[in-house]
Protein backbone atom coordinates (compact mmCIF):
# COMPACT_ATOMS: atom_id res chain seq x y z
CA UNK A 1 0.00 0.00 0.00
CA UNK A 2 2.89 2.35 0.70
CA UNK A 3 4.16 1.89 -2.87
CA UNK A 4 0.76 2.29 -4.49
CA UNK A 5 -0.13 5.27 -2.33
CA UNK A 6 3.07 7.15 -2.98
CA UNK A 7 3.05 6.48 -6.72
CA UNK A 8 -0.65 7.40 -6.87
CA UNK A 9 0.23 10.78 -5.39
CA UNK A 10 3.14 11.17 -7.78
CA UNK A 11 1.06 10.31 -10.83
CA UNK A 12 -1.82 12.61 -9.85
CA UNK A 13 0.66 15.42 -9.34
CA UNK A 14 2.24 14.80 -12.76
CA UNK A 15 -1.19 14.72 -14.40
CA UNK A 16 -2.29 18.01 -12.81
CA UNK A 17 0.99 19.65 -13.76
CA UNK A 18 0.70 18.37 -17.33
CA UNK A 19 -2.86 19.70 -17.76
CA UNK A 20 -1.83 23.05 -16.29
CA UNK A 21 1.12 23.44 -18.60
CA UNK A 22 -0.39 22.18 -21.87
CA UNK A 23 -2.08 25.41 -22.98
CA UNK A 24 0.92 27.65 -22.39
CA UNK A 25 3.29 25.07 -23.91
CA UNK A 26 2.17 26.14 -27.37
CA UNK A 27 3.70 29.57 -26.83
CA UNK A 28 6.68 28.92 -24.56
CA UNK A 29 7.75 25.38 -25.44
CA UNK A 30 11.30 25.44 -24.17
CA UNK A 31 10.84 27.02 -20.75
CA UNK A 32 7.70 25.05 -19.92
CA UNK A 33 9.27 21.74 -20.95
CA UNK A 34 12.24 22.46 -18.69
CA UNK A 35 9.90 23.13 -15.76
CA UNK A 36 8.00 19.88 -16.33
CA UNK A 37 11.23 17.91 -16.67
CA UNK A 38 12.57 19.30 -13.41
CA UNK A 39 9.48 18.24 -11.54
CA UNK A 40 9.41 14.81 -13.20
CA UNK A 41 12.99 14.35 -12.06
CA UNK A 42 12.02 15.11 -8.47
CA UNK A 43 9.34 12.44 -8.65
CA UNK A 44 11.79 10.00 -10.14
CA UNK A 45 14.04 10.57 -7.15
CA UNK A 46 11.13 9.75 -4.85
CA UNK A 47 10.63 6.46 -6.69
CA UNK A 48 14.33 5.65 -6.34
CA UNK A 49 14.13 6.48 -2.64
CA UNK A 50 11.17 4.15 -2.30
CA UNK A 51 13.23 1.30 -3.76
CA UNK A 52 15.67 1.63 -0.89
CA UNK A 53 12.98 1.71 1.77
CA UNK A 54 13.33 -0.97 4.43
CA UNK A 55 9.82 -2.16 3.76
CA UNK A 56 10.72 -2.83 0.14
CA UNK A 57 13.79 -4.75 1.14
CA UNK A 58 11.84 -6.85 3.62
CA UNK A 59 8.73 -7.50 1.56
CA UNK A 60 9.54 -9.31 -1.69
CA UNK A 61 5.87 -9.25 -2.64
CA UNK A 62 6.30 -5.58 -3.52
CA UNK A 63 9.13 -6.23 -5.95
CA UNK A 64 6.90 -6.97 -8.92
CA UNK A 65 4.79 -3.88 -8.31
CA UNK A 66 7.80 -1.61 -8.08
CA UNK A 67 9.23 -3.07 -11.30
CA UNK A 68 5.88 -2.44 -12.98
CA UNK A 69 5.87 1.15 -11.78
CA UNK A 70 9.46 1.69 -12.94
CA UNK A 71 8.82 0.12 -16.35
CA UNK A 72 5.75 2.26 -16.95
CA UNK A 73 7.55 5.38 -15.76
CA UNK A 74 10.53 4.69 -18.06
CA UNK A 75 8.26 4.15 -21.06
CA UNK A 76 6.36 7.36 -20.32
CA UNK A 77 9.64 9.29 -20.09
CA UNK A 78 10.80 7.81 -23.41
CA UNK A 79 7.60 8.94 -25.16
CA UNK A 80 7.92 12.34 -23.52
CA UNK A 81 11.49 12.75 -24.78
CA UNK A 82 10.48 11.62 -28.27
CA UNK A 83 7.87 14.38 -28.37
CA UNK A 84 10.49 16.89 -27.23
CA UNK A 85 12.87 15.84 -30.02
CA UNK A 86 10.14 16.13 -32.64
CA UNK A 87 9.23 19.64 -31.40
CA UNK A 88 5.59 18.71 -31.83
CA UNK A 89 3.13 21.61 -32.14
CA UNK A 90 0.36 20.88 -29.63
CA UNK A 91 -2.26 22.91 -31.50
CA UNK A 92 -1.78 20.76 -34.62
CA UNK A 93 -1.39 17.41 -32.86
CA UNK A 94 -4.08 17.32 -30.20
CA UNK A 95 -4.58 13.57 -30.68
CA UNK A 96 -1.04 12.75 -29.58
CA UNK A 97 -1.14 15.02 -26.56
CA UNK A 98 -4.60 13.78 -25.60
CA UNK A 99 -3.21 10.25 -25.62
CA UNK A 100 -0.32 11.33 -23.41
CA UNK A 101 -2.82 12.98 -21.05
CA UNK A 102 -4.85 9.75 -20.96
CA UNK A 103 -1.75 7.74 -20.09
CA UNK A 104 -0.99 10.04 -17.17
CA UNK A 105 -4.59 9.66 -16.02
CA UNK A 106 -4.22 5.86 -16.00
CA UNK A 107 -1.00 6.20 -14.02
CA UNK A 108 -2.72 8.46 -11.50
CA UNK A 109 -5.25 5.66 -10.88
CA UNK A 110 -2.59 2.96 -10.61
CA UNK A 111 -3.85 1.31 -13.79
CA UNK A 112 -0.45 0.32 -15.14
CA UNK A 113 -1.74 -2.25 -17.64
CA UNK A 114 -3.91 0.32 -19.43
CA UNK A 115 -1.07 2.85 -19.27
CA UNK A 116 1.27 0.35 -20.94
CA UNK A 117 -1.30 -0.51 -23.62
CA UNK A 118 -1.77 3.15 -24.45
CA UNK A 119 1.96 3.79 -24.48
CA UNK A 120 2.20 1.24 -27.30
CA UNK A 121 -0.53 3.12 -29.17
CA UNK A 122 1.24 6.42 -28.53
CA UNK A 123 4.48 5.00 -29.93
CA UNK A 124 2.67 4.08 -33.15
CA UNK A 125 1.19 7.57 -33.40
CA UNK A 126 4.61 9.16 -32.89
CA UNK A 127 6.03 6.93 -35.62
CA UNK A 128 3.15 7.97 -37.87
CA UNK A 129 4.03 11.61 -37.22
CA UNK A 130 7.63 10.87 -38.16
CA UNK A 131 6.38 9.39 -41.42
CA UNK A 132 4.35 12.54 -42.10
CA UNK A 133 7.40 14.70 -41.52
CA UNK A 134 9.37 12.39 -43.80
CA UNK A 135 6.82 12.83 -46.59
CA UNK A 136 7.27 16.59 -46.34
CA UNK A 137 11.00 16.06 -46.78
CA UNK A 138 10.26 13.99 -49.87
CA UNK A 139 8.51 16.99 -51.41
CA UNK A 140 11.62 19.08 -50.67
CA UNK A 141 13.70 16.62 -52.72
CA UNK A 142 11.92 17.80 -55.87
CA UNK A 143 13.08 21.36 -55.23
CA UNK A 144 16.85 20.78 -55.07
CA UNK A 145 19.49 20.13 -57.69
CA UNK A 146 20.74 16.56 -57.94
CA UNK A 147 24.47 16.01 -57.56
CA UNK A 148 26.61 13.17 -56.24
CA UNK A 149 29.68 15.42 -56.06
CA UNK A 150 30.85 17.43 -53.06
CA UNK A 151 31.17 21.19 -53.54
CA UNK A 152 34.77 22.36 -54.04
CA UNK A 153 34.14 25.17 -51.57
CA UNK A 154 31.28 26.97 -49.90
CA UNK A 155 27.73 25.91 -49.10
CA UNK A 156 25.43 23.73 -51.17
CA UNK A 157 21.98 22.18 -50.78
CA UNK A 158 21.67 19.23 -53.12
CA UNK A 159 20.06 15.86 -53.66
CA UNK A 160 22.30 12.79 -53.48
CA UNK A 161 21.03 9.57 -55.03
CA UNK A 162 21.76 6.39 -53.08
CA UNK A 163 20.26 2.99 -53.89
CA UNK A 164 17.48 4.59 -55.91
CA UNK A 165 16.54 7.08 -53.17
CA UNK A 166 17.39 10.78 -53.17
CA UNK A 167 18.57 12.38 -49.92
CA UNK A 168 18.68 16.13 -49.37
CA UNK A 169 21.96 17.29 -47.86
CA UNK A 170 23.08 20.72 -46.66
CA UNK A 171 26.87 20.69 -46.87
CA UNK A 172 29.70 23.19 -46.59
CA UNK A 173 33.24 22.60 -47.83
CA UNK A 174 36.29 24.61 -46.74
CA UNK A 175 40.01 24.23 -47.33
CA UNK A 176 42.10 23.60 -44.23
CA UNK A 177 44.81 25.70 -45.89
CA UNK A 178 42.70 28.77 -45.14
CA UNK A 179 40.27 27.49 -42.48
CA UNK A 180 40.71 26.39 -38.89
CA UNK A 181 38.27 24.07 -37.10
CA UNK A 182 37.78 25.04 -33.45
CA UNK A 183 35.41 24.06 -30.66
CA UNK A 184 33.68 26.75 -28.63
CA UNK A 185 32.39 25.72 -25.19
CA UNK A 186 30.12 27.42 -22.68
CA UNK A 187 32.12 26.07 -19.76
CA UNK A 188 35.83 26.68 -19.27
CA UNK A 189 36.40 23.28 -17.63
CA UNK A 190 34.67 19.98 -16.87
CA UNK A 191 31.05 20.23 -15.76
CA UNK A 192 28.85 17.38 -14.50
CA UNK A 193 25.47 19.05 -13.88
CA UNK A 194 23.56 22.25 -14.65
CA UNK A 195 26.20 23.06 -17.24
CA UNK A 196 26.01 26.36 -19.14
CA UNK A 197 24.70 26.29 -22.71
CA UNK A 198 24.36 28.70 -25.60
CA UNK A 199 23.12 28.95 -29.19
CA UNK A 200 25.22 27.93 -32.17
CA UNK A 201 24.94 31.49 -33.50
CA UNK A 202 26.57 32.71 -30.29
CA UNK A 203 29.37 30.15 -30.54
CA UNK A 204 30.10 31.18 -34.15
CA UNK A 205 30.07 34.86 -33.22
CA UNK A 206 32.28 34.29 -30.19
CA UNK A 207 34.81 32.38 -32.28
CA UNK A 208 34.77 34.89 -35.13
CA UNK A 209 33.67 32.17 -37.51
CA UNK A 210 31.75 32.04 -40.78
CA UNK A 211 30.02 28.67 -40.21
CA UNK A 212 29.25 26.18 -37.48
CA UNK A 213 27.55 22.88 -36.68
CA UNK A 214 26.23 21.37 -33.46
CA UNK A 215 28.60 19.09 -31.58
CA UNK A 216 28.49 15.53 -30.18
CA UNK A 217 25.77 14.06 -27.97
CA UNK A 218 25.05 15.57 -24.56
CA UNK A 219 22.34 15.28 -21.90
CA UNK A 220 19.65 17.97 -22.49
CA UNK A 221 18.13 19.64 -19.45
CA UNK A 222 14.58 18.92 -20.65
CA UNK A 223 15.16 15.14 -20.61
CA UNK A 224 13.91 13.58 -17.35
CA UNK A 225 16.51 10.83 -17.84
CA UNK A 226 19.24 13.49 -17.57
CA UNK A 227 18.43 14.38 -13.97
CA UNK A 228 21.64 15.06 -12.06
CA UNK A 229 23.70 15.50 -15.23
CA UNK A 230 21.85 18.20 -17.15
CA UNK A 231 23.64 19.68 -20.17
CA UNK A 232 26.72 17.57 -19.47
CA UNK A 233 28.68 15.37 -21.87
CA UNK A 234 31.20 12.61 -21.28
CA UNK A 235 33.22 12.33 -24.49
CA UNK A 236 36.71 13.71 -25.08
CA UNK A 237 36.81 17.26 -26.44
CA UNK A 238 39.54 19.90 -26.77
CA UNK A 239 38.29 23.47 -27.14
CA UNK A 240 40.00 26.49 -28.69
CA UNK A 241 41.66 27.28 -25.35
CA UNK A 242 43.42 23.88 -25.50
CA UNK A 243 41.45 22.49 -22.56
CA UNK A 244 40.69 18.78 -22.72
CA UNK A 245 37.21 18.05 -21.37
CA UNK A 246 36.57 14.67 -19.72
CA UNK A 247 40.22 13.74 -19.96
CA UNK A 248 40.32 11.43 -16.94
CA UNK A 249 37.20 9.42 -17.79
CA UNK A 250 38.25 8.76 -21.39
CA UNK A 251 41.52 6.97 -20.69
CA UNK A 252 39.93 3.71 -21.88
CA UNK A 253 37.24 5.17 -24.15
CA UNK A 254 36.35 3.37 -27.38
CA UNK A 255 34.57 6.43 -28.82
CA UNK A 256 36.26 7.51 -32.10
CA UNK A 257 37.78 10.99 -32.36
CA UNK A 258 38.54 13.43 -35.17
CA UNK A 259 41.61 15.67 -34.82
CA UNK A 260 42.24 18.83 -36.82
CA UNK A 261 45.74 20.27 -36.98
CA UNK A 262 47.12 22.79 -39.44
CA UNK A 263 45.95 21.86 -42.93
CA UNK A 264 45.11 18.23 -42.16
CA UNK A 265 42.62 16.02 -40.35
CA UNK A 266 42.93 12.51 -38.96
CA UNK A 267 40.71 9.94 -37.27
CA UNK A 268 41.53 7.66 -34.36
CA UNK A 269 39.30 4.65 -33.85
CA UNK A 270 39.29 5.06 -30.06
CA UNK A 271 39.74 8.17 -27.90
CA UNK A 272 42.08 6.12 -25.73
CA UNK A 273 44.50 5.98 -28.69
CA UNK A 274 44.96 9.74 -28.54
CA UNK A 275 47.18 11.54 -26.04
CA UNK A 276 46.55 15.06 -24.83
CA UNK A 277 48.53 17.02 -27.42
CA UNK A 278 47.64 20.72 -27.22
CA UNK A 279 49.52 21.57 -30.40
CA UNK A 280 46.50 20.63 -32.52
CA UNK A 281 43.55 22.91 -33.33
CA UNK A 282 40.72 20.71 -32.04
CA UNK A 283 39.82 17.22 -30.86
CA UNK A 284 36.23 16.01 -31.25
CA UNK A 285 35.14 12.58 -30.01
CA UNK A 286 31.71 11.48 -31.19
CA UNK A 287 29.88 8.40 -32.33
CA UNK A 288 29.32 6.41 -34.31
CA UNK A 289 32.21 6.46 -36.77
CA UNK A 290 30.62 6.70 -40.22
CA UNK A 291 33.54 6.49 -42.65
CA UNK A 292 37.26 5.83 -42.45
CA UNK A 293 39.58 5.42 -45.42
CA UNK A 294 36.62 6.14 -47.67
CA UNK A 295 34.79 3.02 -46.46
CA UNK A 296 31.65 2.68 -44.35
CA UNK A 297 32.51 1.68 -40.78
CA UNK A 298 29.04 1.82 -39.27
CA UNK A 299 26.66 -1.13 -39.25
CA UNK A 300 23.18 -1.00 -37.76
CA UNK A 301 23.17 -1.52 -33.99
CA UNK A 302 20.47 -1.85 -31.34
CA UNK A 303 20.01 1.90 -30.81
CA UNK A 304 16.49 2.55 -32.11
CA UNK A 305 17.11 6.29 -32.32
CA UNK A 306 19.78 5.66 -34.96
CA UNK A 307 17.41 3.62 -37.12
CA UNK A 308 14.73 6.34 -37.17
CA UNK A 309 14.75 8.82 -40.02
CA UNK A 310 15.52 12.42 -39.17
CA UNK A 311 17.88 15.34 -39.79
CA UNK A 312 21.39 14.22 -38.88
CA UNK A 313 24.54 16.32 -38.47
CA UNK A 314 28.07 15.24 -39.37
CA UNK A 315 31.64 16.47 -39.60
CA UNK A 316 33.95 15.00 -42.24
CA UNK A 317 37.08 15.47 -44.33
CA UNK A 318 38.72 14.51 -47.62
CA UNK A 319 42.34 15.42 -48.18
CA UNK A 320 42.77 18.98 -46.93
CA UNK A 321 39.05 19.78 -47.12
CA UNK A 322 36.72 19.84 -44.12
CA UNK A 323 32.98 19.28 -44.50
CA UNK A 324 30.15 20.00 -42.09
CA UNK A 325 26.51 19.45 -42.82
CA UNK A 326 23.10 17.88 -42.28
CA UNK A 327 21.49 14.99 -44.15
CA UNK A 328 17.69 15.24 -44.11
CA UNK A 329 15.24 12.42 -43.45
CA UNK A 330 17.90 9.74 -43.01
CA UNK A 331 18.95 7.03 -40.61
CA UNK A 332 22.55 6.99 -39.38
CA UNK A 333 23.33 4.11 -41.76
CA UNK A 334 21.90 6.11 -44.66
CA UNK A 335 24.05 9.13 -43.74
CA UNK A 336 27.12 6.91 -44.02
CA UNK A 337 25.99 5.78 -47.50
CA UNK A 338 25.34 9.36 -48.62
CA UNK A 339 28.81 10.50 -47.53
CA UNK A 340 30.49 7.51 -49.16
CA UNK A 341 28.64 8.30 -52.39
CA UNK A 342 30.05 11.84 -52.19
CA UNK A 343 33.57 10.45 -51.94
CA UNK A 344 34.19 11.53 -48.34
CA UNK A 345 37.30 10.03 -46.72
CA UNK A 346 36.43 10.13 -43.01
CA UNK A 347 33.33 11.19 -41.07
CA UNK A 348 31.82 11.25 -37.59
CA UNK A 349 28.15 11.35 -36.68
CA UNK A 350 27.13 14.25 -34.42
CA UNK A 351 24.09 14.85 -32.21
CA UNK A 352 20.73 14.94 -33.98
CA UNK A 353 17.03 15.38 -33.24
CA UNK A 354 16.32 18.56 -31.31
CA UNK A 355 20.03 19.43 -31.28
CA UNK A 356 20.50 19.54 -35.07
CA UNK A 357 21.74 23.01 -36.00
CA UNK A 358 23.76 24.34 -38.95
CA UNK A 359 24.85 27.98 -39.32
CA UNK A 360 26.32 29.41 -42.52
CA UNK A 361 27.19 33.01 -43.39
CA UNK A 362 24.97 34.69 -40.82
CA UNK A 363 21.90 32.45 -40.82
CA UNK A 364 20.59 29.04 -39.86
CA UNK A 365 20.18 26.58 -42.71
CA UNK A 366 19.09 23.92 -40.21
CA UNK A 367 17.60 24.64 -36.81
CA UNK A 368 17.94 26.53 -34.59
CA UNK A 369 17.95 23.53 -32.31
CA UNK A 370 18.18 23.49 -28.54
CA UNK A 371 20.98 25.35 -26.78
CA UNK A 372 24.04 23.17 -26.24
CA UNK A 373 27.27 23.19 -24.18
CA UNK A 374 29.46 23.44 -27.28
CA UNK A 375 29.61 24.22 -30.98
CA UNK A 376 32.01 23.33 -33.80
CA UNK A 377 33.09 26.52 -35.58
CA UNK A 378 34.97 27.19 -38.84
CA UNK A 379 37.12 30.33 -38.81
CA UNK A 380 39.36 31.95 -41.40
CA UNK A 381 43.09 31.71 -40.72
Question: Where are the model-predicted features located?
Answer:
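Amphipathic, heptad-repeat alpha-helical segments
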Residues: 21-28, 32, 40-100, 104-106
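Active-site-adjacent helix-turn-beta-strand microarchitecture at beta-sheet edges
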Residues: 218-296
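Zymogen propeptides
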Residues: 2-17, 117-120, 124-247
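Acidic, low-complexity intrinsically disordered segments
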Residues: 1-34, 38
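Conserved, well-ordered active-site substructure
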Residues: 225-246, 300-350, 355-381
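Short acidic-glycine loop/turn motifs at beta-strand connectors
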Residues: 175-178, 220, 239, 259-265, ...
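Short glycine-rich loop/turn motifs
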Residues: 166-171, 254-255, 309-314, 373
